[in-house]
Amino acid sequence: ERIPVIGGTKRIHLDRIEQLKPDLVIASKEENTREDVEACRAFTEVLVTDVRTIPDAFEALEAIGDALEKAAAGVTWRSNIETAWGEPRAQHAQALYAIWQNPLMVAGHDTYIHAAMNWWGIGNAAPAAAEGRYPELPAEQLDALAGTPILLASEPYPFASKHCAQFASAGLRPMLVDGEAFSWYGSRMLHTVDYLKDMRQTLDQLPH
């Protein structure tokens, strides 16, 4: 059965959502606007998630289970993912994580991406003093990060092999990565364990 298209996170079609008569709308504080959330609350229940850390992601699984009246399933999902993810790893490798091009924007330190990197032992090389959750990095800051690996995510900006030369010429070490593995929380976390382990090992094995 074809799933109706209701728009993207920034531009949702409220009329189409209302026509579907949902029992629940799950929104993200980071992605969805207050206006859209309040508009949805006029015709249905809304659960707003605010996930910035790995424990936040674990708790969101149970919250979604409760909201769907599937509390036991939520607890099971949480338990399975907590077991799969284990304890945070010691940090060795450092990397930037690029989410956008022109201007270059990277994941800052108050993001789920940062938390996922840290959990798997990848330090975030973005300047701690950079403003905003996804700060822009000007050329002079890149100069100071010469030799640093930069992870070029597949989303939201679709980085591809054609972009690698630009970053290599700036003295960085570009690597294309699956954006979903680093930025999608929820049940997807169960399927990204091996990928994130391998990415950490790859970074650790880079010559210094």
Q: Which sequence ranges carry the predicted segments?
A:
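N-terminal ligand-binding lobe of clamshell/alpha-beta domains
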Residues: 1-208
